[in-house]
Each structure stands twice: as structure tokens, then as C-alpha cells.
């Protein structure tokens, strides 16, 4: 007998005689206090490495490749998206985030990805990015 058949037969049996079934609970034994009781979690001291949960930040320096050379820098969490990074850089450069293209080690950075996808924060504290400013009119 498969698990589905066992469950079906149990439900059929329960629907035929719900009051007499051994798994049924009499309605008078159910009250609102039984339903709304909160069970506190046990207090256990954390045994792991707290450094895993700390926010890791890197210093990002983005510099244009072509003249006129422009530069922007910020301290940012590696769990930030590339779009969030572009928004910070754009505010410093007085431009739109959509006009900024960033590259790291020859690879374009995708807006929806995390900075952590490209940079290892454990081994790097400063990241130098190539920046391209597009003329959007």
C-alpha cells in the first residue's frame, strides 16, 4: 500500500466516524487557551563562530578608464547588490545609476548580483573597479 493510499484510507475512515476515531479530540477539551499558548525557545548559548554573522565591508574605489578621469569611493557591505553600489557612486558623481557600468578584473558587474559574488571579503579589504559613464540623453 502506498503512502497516498494509506492517507486516503485514513481520511475516509475518519470522515465516516469522526467522534469515535481514536485520533479525534473531543471538542470540549479544546479551548482558546490551548490554541494560543506560546512555547518559549530554550536558551542555549551559541557555540558557533560569531564572525560568520558580522557584516563584512570593503572599501570600493571606482575610476573611469577614459578621460576625463573621474573617481568615486565608498565603504560598502559585501551583501549589497551592485545596483546599491551604483546608487552610492552615482550620488557622488551627480549622475544616474543607469549610466554607470562597472567592471572587476575584466568582468562586467550585474546589477542584481551581490558584491560578495565577485569579491572575497576575507582576503580583500579594498576593491578597485573600472567605471564607464554612459551619456544618457
Swiss-Prot record:
Q: Which Pfam families match?
A: ubiquitin (PF00240)
Where found? Cytoplasm; Nucleus
Q: Predominant location of this chain?
A: cytoplasm
**Which keywords describe this protein according to UniProt?**
Cytoplasm, Nucleus
Its GO CC terms are: cytosol; nucleus
- Name the PROSITE patterns for this protein: UBIQUITIN_2 (PS50053)
InterPro entries (UniProt xref): Ubiquitin-like_dom, Ubiquitin-like_domsf
Q: Residues in domain Ubiquitin-like? A: 58-135
Q: What is this protein called?
A: Uncharacterized ubiquitin-like protein C800.12c
Organism, as annotated: Schizosaccharomyces pombe (strain 972 / ATCC 24843)
Amino acid at each position: 500500500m502506498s503512502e497516498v493510499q494509506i492517507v486516503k484510507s485514513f481520511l475516509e475512515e475518519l470522515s465516516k466516524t469522526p467522534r469515535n476515531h481514536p485520533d479525534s479530540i473531543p471538542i470540549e477539551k479544546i479551548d482558546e487557551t490551548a490554541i494560543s499558548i506560546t512555547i518559549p525557545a530554550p536558551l542555549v548559548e551559541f557555540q558557533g563562530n560569531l564572525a560568520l554573522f558580522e557584516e563584512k565591508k570593503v572599501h570600493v574605489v571606482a575610476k573611469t578608464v577614459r578621460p576625463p578621469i573621474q573617481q568615486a569611493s565608498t565603504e560598502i557591505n559585501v551583501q549589497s547588490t551592485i545596483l546599491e553600489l551604483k546608487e552610492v557612486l552615482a550620488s557622488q558623481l551627480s549622475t544616474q545609476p543607469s549610466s554607470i557600468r562597472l567592471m572587476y578584473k575584466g568582468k562586467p558587474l550585474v546589477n542584481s548580483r551581490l558584491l560578495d559574488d565577485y569579491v572575497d571579503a576575507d582576503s580583500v579589504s579594498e576593491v578597485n573597479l573600472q567605471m564607464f559613464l554612459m551619456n544618457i540623453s
